[in-house]
């Protein structure tokens, strides 16, 4: 009997999340006009995994939701974003995980790994801050690596193209899943975790290079983006 009640509770836990996602979909599609490239083909996105992306705009979490529209994606949100009752309601409804950047607690760590182990999808921006001044990605922190390692889930690298204007179309490039345990072993040291973070950073830089190669090819050949996207999909 308790199990049935638990399942029913789980169902309604995501009611507002799904409501906001569905009702906001049209607005997001018109405003963001998302476009996604898969250099290596669309990755397997079943089960739990972590999304690692660069942080280049305030609406990056929304762009990620549009990129992985068929999954519920949960993001980390700093505690200062919960400054009003309305904000708290919104972020709690979207099932965000509240964190303190100055003092990342074990509770936040355990909540992230718990959801990953349950097959959920967590999005993390490992630069640790919003990077609006440079197209170059900042060094990645190893905390995301440790959480993915603890939950034994892959990391899917994503490069978000920084927009020049707020109304620009949002473009994302999705790479192949990365198994961090294959990089740093079963019982990693701090140095091995940092090395794994560098590998993820490198993979996202490769996605950035891929995007610019497509953009340059587009400009050189006078192709529109849909033609280029078709070529990418065939590879």
What do the PLM-derived regions correspond to, one by one?
Residues 43-103:
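Catalytic core of membrane glycerolipid acyltransferases/transacylases, capturing the structured
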Residues 27, 68, 90-91, 115, ...:
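A generic structural signal for well-ordered alpha-helical segments
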Residues 24-55:
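Helix-to-loop junction immediately C-terminal to a conserved catalytic motif
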Residues 2-12, 109-235:
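Non-catalytic C-terminal accessory region of glycerolipid acyltransferases
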């Amino acid at each position: 009997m308790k199990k049935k009640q638990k399942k029913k509770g789980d169902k309604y836990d995501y009611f507002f999340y799904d409501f906001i996602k569905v009702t906001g979909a049209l607005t997001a599609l018109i405003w963001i006009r998302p476009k996604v490239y898969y250099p290596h083909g669309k990755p397997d996105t079943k089960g739990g995994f972590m999304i690692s992306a660069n942080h280049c705009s305030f609406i990056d979490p929304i762009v990620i939701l549009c990129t992985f529209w068929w999954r519920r994606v949960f993001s980390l949100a700093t505690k200062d974003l919960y400054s009003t009752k309305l904000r708290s309601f919104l972020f709690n409804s979207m099932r965000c995980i509240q964190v303190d950047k100055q003092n990342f607690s074990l509770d936040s760590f355990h909540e992230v790994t718990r959801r990953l182990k349950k097959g959920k999808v967590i999005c993390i921006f490992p630069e640790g801050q919003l990077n609006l001044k440079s197209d170059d990605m900042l060094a990645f922190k190893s905390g995301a690596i440790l959480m993915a390692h603890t939950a034994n889930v892959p990391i899917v690298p994503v490069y978000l193209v920084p927009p020049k204007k707020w109304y620009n179309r949002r473009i994302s490039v999705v790479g192949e899943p990365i198994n961090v345990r294959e990089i740093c072993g079963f019982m990693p040291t701090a140095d091995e975790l940092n090395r794994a973070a560098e590998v993820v950073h490198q993979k996202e830089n490769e996605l950035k290079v891929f995007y610019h190669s497509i953009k340059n090819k587009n400009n050189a050949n006078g192709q529109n983006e849909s033609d280029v996207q078709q070529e990418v999909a065939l590879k």
